[in-house]
Regions:
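Long, highly hydrophobic alpha-helical transmembrane signal-anchor segments
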Residues: 1-26, 121
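Functional transmembrane core segments of multi-pass inner-membrane proteins
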Residues: 7, 97, 101-207, 246-247
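Alpha-helical transmembrane segments of multipass membrane proteins
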Residues: 14-19, 80, 84, 134, ...
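Membrane-proximal soluble regions of multi-pass membrane proteins
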Residues: 18-75, 226
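Hydrophobic alpha-helical transmembrane segments and immediately flanking/interface helices
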Residues: 72-80, 96-100, 213-226
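Transmembrane helix-loop-helix
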Residues: 86-98
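Interfacial loop-to-transmembrane junctions
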Residues: 174-176, 209-236
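Juxtamembrane boundary at the C-terminal end of a transmembrane helix
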Residues: 239-247
Length: 247
């Protein structure tokens, strides 16, 4: 129970940073320095920056000018806290902490792809490096398993993108998608990679069909944030693989 509460607290703090990063980075604004109200520019104090609680206490408004604070902050903080709670409740111990860390690192990538169709190389590199260094106990994979997962995942997506360009004469996949899948392979190894790709493909297809409106472009011509669905699938693949493999 202590681990679950601690994971929720860490998630709230991490979520606060991630929300700031996702809102500022694409706009070319620094993610460092003191936080300010977007409406009045007033520097926010410590009591204004307590994750989730400050927003609840101020009813989602700036203490200085009364302007509404973007609810995106609170949603990301709550989502990151729930990631920690779910991970440690389902998979106690070191494997659960690694699962939580994995998804916390996936969170900014998922949000940036959903909002901007952008998967920054730097975030993919951090995800990959941490996975190669630390992820072994999460699914019981060896370093070789994770290297093979990275190479197989990255090459499979790159080959798929190349084939689409050859057949259709246009881009069917963003350049960050193969790098993201390679980075995910650094965490889950080659064994769970097919499950993750299957879940990502199915969820992306369901989303595309569910959001297809009359008069929209054909499905083949629509831009789907595959990175978002790869992140969601990676989250789900960890407990599913542990269950399927009897670990």
């Amino acid at each position: 129970m202590v681990d679950v509460i601690l994971a929720a607290a860490i998630g709230l703090i991490w979520g606060s940073f991630i929300a700031t990063l996702v809102l500022r980075w694409p706009a070319g604004r620094s993610v460092h320095g003191r936080s300010r109200c977007d409406a009045c520019g007033q520097t926010l104090g410590v009591r204004d920056l307590v994750p989730l609680l400050s927003a609840l206490a101020r009813r989602g408004r700036c203490r200085h000018c009364g302007a509404a604070i973007d609810p995106f902050h609170a949603r990301v903080e709550l989502g990151a806290a729930m990631i920690g709670v779910v991970a440690l409740a389902i998979v106690p111990g070191p494997a659960g902490w690694l699962w939580a860390a994995f998804v916390w690192l996936l969170l900014p990538l998922a949000l940036l792809d959903a909002r901007h169709l952008w998967l920054p190389d730097r975030l993919n590199a951090v995800l990959a490096a941490v996975g190669l260094l630390l992820a072994g106990p999460m699914l019981g994979t060896s370093l070789l398993d994770r290297w093979i997962g990275a190479l197989a995942g990255g090459l499979a997506l790159a080959l798929l993108g190349w084939s689409y360009r050859r057949l259709r004469g246009g881009e069917g996949m963003g350049g960050g998608d193969p790098k993201l899948v390679a980075a995910i392979g650094c965490w889950i190894g080659w064994q769970a990679l097919p499950l993750m790709l299957l879940l990502a493909s199915l969820s992306g297809l369901v989303w595309a069909l569910a959001t297809q409106g009359k008069g929209d472009r054909p499905l083949a011509a629509r831009r789907v944030p595959f990175g978002l669905f790869a992140c969601i699938a990676a989250f789900a693949a960890v407990p599913l693989w542990l269950w399927l493999s009897g670990r």
